[in-house]
Structure formats: C-alpha cells, structure tokens
Amino acid sequence: MTVDLDQYAKPGKDYYLALGLEGSANKLGVGVIKHNLGQLSLDNRAEILSNVRDTYVTPPGEGFLPRDTARHHRNWAVRIIKKALIEAKVKGSDLDCICFTQGPGMGAPLQSVVIAARTLSQLWDLPLVGVNHCVGHIEMGREITGADNPVVLYVSGGNTQVIAYSRQRYRIFGETLDIAIGNCLDRFARTLRIPNEPAPGYNIEQMAKKGKHLVPLPYTVKGMDLSMSGILAHVDSLAKDLFAENKNKKLIDDETGEQITSEDLCFSLQETLFSMLVEITERAMAHVQSNQVLIVGGVGSNERLQQMMELMVNDRKNGSIFATDERFCIDNGIMIAHAGLLGYRMGQTNELWNTVCTQRFRTDEVFVKWRDD
C-alpha cells in the first residue's frame, strides 16, 4: 500500500522545505532539507541544502555536564541557524515547518533547542514538528543509503538498540540493559585521559588500531539484550592498575609475556563490545528474515564495527550492510529536518503546548504514519 505524502501540499508549490534543530547531547546541529512532491525514491531523493554542526568539547578526562552543554547551545544557536539558512540559500519565509528534537536526550540541552524552535515558529508563523531522535537517525540512514527494510543497529552515546520495522512502528528487538555503547567508550576515554576532540570514541578507535593483544573481558549477552557496565568496570580497573604500575597478571600477555598497553585495552574493549552487537543483530535478522543491516548513530561510523558486521552479513545469503559517514552518523540537524518533514507531509504537527521535550522517548512510541509497507 502506498502512502499519500502530498495530501497536505500547498497549492502551486511543487516542493517542501524544512529546517531541523538537533541538540540532545553535546552537538548542536541545524539542517535544511528539500522534498519534491511525490514518493521519495531513488529517482526522487531528498535534497540536503545545508547541514551545519558545532560540538561542545571538554578537556581530556572530563565529560559534558547538561547545564554547560545547554549554555553552549544557547550561545551558538543563532549563529548556526543563520549559517544553515545562508548555505541553503533560503529565507525563513520559504520554509514549510520547523522540526526539532523532542527526545530522548539530556534535559537542559533539549530545552535550549526547543526554545529556539518555538521562537522561530512564532517569528516566521510556521508549524512545529517534534521528532524522536532515534527515528531521525533511522530515516536519514534509509534515505542516504537506499536501504529498503533493514534491521537497524542504533549505536550512540545514549542509545544501543536493535530495531526492525513492523506495522508502522520501529520495534525494539534488543537493547542495552544499562549504559549505551557510546557512553561506555567515552567513559573509558576519560579513564585514559585521552582528548575529547574530535570525539573520545574516535580516539579510542585510533588507539585500538595499534593494539596487538586481546585481553579477556566479560561478555554479557542476555537473550537479545546486552550489558556493558560490568565490562567498563573491569577494563577501568585494568587501566588504573596499568597507570599505577601495579602487578596484575592480567596485564601480561599469556603467549608472549609482553606488557599489556593502553592500546591493547582499547582494542580488547572494542572487539568485545562489537562482538556482542554482531551477535544480537544477527539473531534479529534471523527472526525477521532480513538480509539487510543498517548501522546508525555516532558509534556507527566506527570502521571496525562496520568491518565486523560486514563479515557476519557476508556469511548470509544475499546479505548487505549499509552505513553512513560521520556527516550523518553523528548527531545532526538534517536528520531531524528529514524525519520531521516526513511527519509534516502526513499532517503530523505539534501545537505550542505540546512541544515539551522529554528525556525518555522510546523509539517504538512513534507512529510511523509515512510508512505502510
């Protein structure tokens, strides 16, 4: 069944324009997207007019606090919005709607973005569209890669989920029971006191490429779910012993007798976590009888994760893997603009009173009205 995406089209206009605002964590993103009339397809793709982002970066060994992150977003919002509009070569009066991240995420940064969205809505007399952050990642990934109906591995600083579409919902088949994978990697980066720029997870990835020895770490998969807090606690204790030069037989490689390094710990942590993700993703693929995997979220840009997932997919008949680069994996405004515009085209808008952001907003709470396949 084909969904009519143009039942709310404005007379005499053959395209839609939306501005998206993202700020659920330490990245403030603004994007402008264009949809032509008709179904989106390989012959009628969404057009990215601008995708601007600024990141709040803290010193090595420190995380980002909600109040400081919110202050960054407030300080940069006007400049980033202006830059996005200039790059897109559009004015506020050209837009059809203002889309914003309604959740999930950090409360104070989300509020800063919502206030900016409300201000623009009233300034330009445009409707507001609240967007689920997770659905934004999924829809942007589908649009960029052309993936049809994949199993989605959503891995970021605040979320770890295995998702598949069914009956106008993105259903969660497996997820973390405690911390997200991005949070796990970021916290270990703080333990090692490595730089947060360009991103702690990226710096962990680069160190892991130099690792040679695989240190045994807890492997915690429980059915379709996984747990990472125990793994983090274990590898943290090893790192602290390494820095303190404490004698610990686990810091000596059994085969070579060589000293375990920080690079080895990064390598071991990545290999263990990614193996767990591959396992539950493959199980979801078997359950829904899909041969496609789409990786989204900030951790999705990790080359080793993509490589391990590709090895698994290649063992399946006609398997294929889809992923995007850091422009779209890492939090951005264009994904919010795209998902929001899909909702707007189906008549889904938010009244001002219904724009309250929420830190907890499940992926499967969203009614995916623009799909009926």
UniProtKB/Swiss-Prot annotation:
Which residues does the record give as substrate binding sites?
Answer: 154-158, 186, 201, 205, 302
Q: Per its record, what are the GO molecular function terms? A: chromatin DNA binding; metal ion binding; N(6)-L-threonylcarbamoyladenine synthase activity; nucleotidase activity
Answer whether the UniProt record assigns the keyword tRNA processing to this protein: yes
Alphabetical UniProt keywords: Activator, Acyltransferase, Cytoplasm, Metal-binding, Nucleus, Transcription, Transcription regulation, Transferase, tRNA processing
Q: Which residues bind a divalent metal cation?
A: 133, 137, 154, 331
List the record's Gene Ontology CC terms alphabetically: chromatin; cytoplasm; EKC/KEOPS complex; nucleus
Its principal location?
Answer: cytoplasm
Give one Pfam hit by family name. Answer: TsaD
Which EC numbers does the record give? 2.3.1.234
A GO BP term here is:
positive regulation of transcription by RNA polymerase II
Report whether Cytoplasm shows up as a keyword of the record.
yes
* Cofactor list: a divalent metal cation
What SUPFAM superfamilies does this protein map onto?
Answer: Actin-like ATPase domain
Entry's family note: Belongs to the KAE1 / TsaD family.
Q: What does this protein do?
A: Component of the EKC/KEOPS complex that is required for the formation of a threonylcarbamoyl group on adenosine at position 37 (t(6)A37) in tRNAs that read codons beginning with adenine. The complex is probably involved in the transfer of the threonylcarbamoyl moiety of threonylcarbamoyl-AMP (TC-AMP) to the N6 group of A37. KAE1 likely plays a direct catalytic role in this reaction, but requires other protein(s) of the complex to fulfill this activity. The EKC/KEOPS complex also promotes both telomere uncapping and telomere elongation.
- Binding partners and assembly: Component of the EKC/KEOPS complex composed of at least BUD32, CGI121, GON7, KAE1 and PCC1; the whole complex dimerizes.
Q: Per its record, how is this protein called by name?
A: tRNA N6-adenosine threonylcarbamoyltransferase
